Regions:
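Long, internal low-complexity/basic segments
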Residues: 28-33, 40, 44-45, 69, ...
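Loop/turn elements at helix/coil->beta-strand transitions in domains of secreted/extracellular proteins
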Residues: 32-36, 66-71, 125-130, 151, ...
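Active-site segment of extracytoplasmic enzymes that catalyze sulfate/phosphate-ester chemistry
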Residues: 37, 45-130, 140, 145-152, ...
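Short, solvent-exposed turn/loop segments enriched in Gly/Ser/Thr/Pro and often Arg
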Residues: 49-55, 69-91, 99, 131-143, ...
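A short beta-strand-to-alpha-helix junction
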Residues: 53-57, 68, 74-79, 105-116, ...
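Formylglycine-dependent
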Residues: 98-100, 105-108, 112-124, 137-216, ...
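Histidine-centered active-site microenvironments of extracellular/periplasmic hydrolases
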Residues: 141-149, 228-231, 239-247, 260-314, ...
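C-terminal cap/loop subdomain of S1 sulfatases and analogous C-terminal strand-loop tails that border
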Residues: 147, 151-152, 157-161, 281-300, ...
């Protein structure tokens, strides 16, 4: 009887042996995390709950409680195209020829395909890569996401104000909704504008669901809260007619959907999520305690952005860092976490800040200086701003520890500090200008969508 029982148990033992690797894999958390970057457009420093806003942002509030709030995080340029260029390459936009202005529909200029993006680094490490949202780094085929390291793309190729109902002084082609490299819908009216955030979110969530069993990089550059400010009637009603509250609520809900997708697939503890913004706020946004906004002199509200980092059990929950970090640091940080080297054949301006994010003892900012393009510099608590009003030049100095709102100009009291910071800023600008790498250029660029005849609106496309 005992021998028969032993024989009967052998197949069961074999089955357990067969499935043991699968069971082990299901509970195994690899060293290299998935990466999600949520990049908001034109949102102010004070527009979300974790940074003092009265707007209702429950998902971002939870993200901050479960992760880290970065109070001194900066973009490297204060405009759509330059800021995105810096984020994806780890380089100052001026260094790679993308700092002068935004690109327009059918522009001959775009991000040079010879530049190396976060997507290309992670793809080399075996990651699936997807971009969902506003690209705005050139709309010619050699500049688009599929040529810059992304396996998948869905979204709008440039700003949502570059459409037929936009600037009457500029003749725009229809604003296309792209999937891969192909226009599959267009955005002709307010109704179509109002569903863009949901369309971006749905595409990102689908990508995460599809790729949950392998490493992935999901880049989500929203077009909200950039003007024109379009939201669904239902969201506007919930916000009691406050358009900015409705837009911020929309972004909060989108972020919540992405985080919940990670939790539901049980990959949240192996995913780094960064939530940040492309520049200071514009229009009816709030800079909170900061002076300035997207346009104007290089005050803090111009380039300091509300940023959250989330990676359960890795990033200390409820933590706050006031160390200086910037979007140019994301590429080297993510490369290190993925076990990949950063390019050695070119200058990469950013630094690995993973020790700060992971809460390591005594981790400090790698930046001696933070630069505000060509007209501002910060060293520790000291901040120098220079600007022109017509023919007049102005230089101001602030102590950010005592005067975060930059109201008490100390330039006359500390002339030596003004001199030292001015020299450091000029030296930085000189080095950048001496080694500019060219932007990508094409001859005879063509619009992605010259005529919308026969192509559905985005609302129609989503309702198929």
């Amino acid at each position: 009887m005992m021998s028969c029982l032993w024989v009967a148990l052998i197949p069961i033992a074999n089955l357990l042996t067969l499935f043991l690797p699968i069971l082990t894999l299901a509970n195994f958390v690899p060293d290299h995390p998935n990466v999600v970057i949520i990049f908001i457009d034109d949102m102010g420093y004070g527009d979300i709950g974790p940074f003092g806003s009265d707007h209702s942002t429950p998902h971002l509030d939870r993200m901050a409680k479960e992760g880290m709030k970065l109070t001194d995080f900066y973009v490297s340029s204060a405009a759509c195209t330059p800021s995105r260029s810096a984020l994806l390459t780890g380089c100052y936009a001026d260094r790679i020829g993308m700092g002068k202005s935004v690109v327009f529909p059918a522009d001959k200029r775009g991000l040079n395909p010879k530049e190396i993006t976060i997507a290309e680094i992670l793809k080399n490490a075996g990651y699936a890569t997807g971009c969902f949202g506003k690209w705005h780094l050139g709309d010619q085929p050699q500049f688009m996401p599929l040529a810059q390291g992304f396996d998948e793309y869905e979204g709008i190729p440039y700003s949502n104000d570059m459409w037929v109902r936009g600037n009457p002084k500029r003749k725009y082609s229809p604003l296309p909704w792209i999937k891969g490299n192909k226009p599959v819908a267009h955005i002709p009216d307010v109704a179509s504008q109002s569903v863009v955030t949901d369309a971006i979110t749905d595409a990102a969530v689908k990508f995460i669901n599809d790729q949950k069993d392998k490493p992935f990089f999901c880049y989500v550059p929203h077009s909200a809260v950039h003007s024109p400010h379009m939201v669904t009637p239902a969201r506007l009603a919930t916000a009691k007619g406050d358009v900015m509250q409705a837009l911020v609520s929309e972004i909060d809900a989108s972020t919540g959907s992405i985080l919940e997708t990670l939790r539901r697939n049980k990959i949240d503890k192996n995913t780094l999520v960064l939530f940040t913004n492309d520049n200071g706020g514009a229009g009816k946004t709030s800079s909170g305690p900061l002076r300035g906004a997207k346009f104007g002199p290089k005050y803090e509200g111009h380039m300091r952005v509300s940023t959250l980092a989330w990676w359960p059990d890795k990033i200390p929950a409820g933590s706050v860092s006031s160390e200086i970090m910037a979007t140019i640091d994301i590429l080297p940080t993510v490369a290190n976490l993925a076990g990949q080297p950063i390019p050695k054949d070119r200058i990469i301006d950013g630094h690995d800040v993973s020790d700060i994010l992971l809460g390591k003892d005594k981790a400090k900012s790698p930046h001696k200086y933070n630069y505000y393009e060509k007209d501002g510099i910060r060293e520790g608590k000291w901040k120098l701003v220079r600007y022109r009003v017509k023919a007049d030049r102005f230089t101001e100095l602030y102590d950010l520890e005592k005067d975060l709102g930059e109201r008490n100009n100390l330039a006359k009291r500390y002339p030596e500090k003004v001199k030292a910071l001015t020299e450091a800023l000029d030296a930085h600008v000189g080095k950048i200008e001496a080694g500019i790498r060219p932007a990508g250029l094409v001859e005879n660029p063509k619009p992605l969508l010259a005529d919308s005849n026969g192509i559905p609106t985005l609302v129609e496309y989503r309702n198929k």
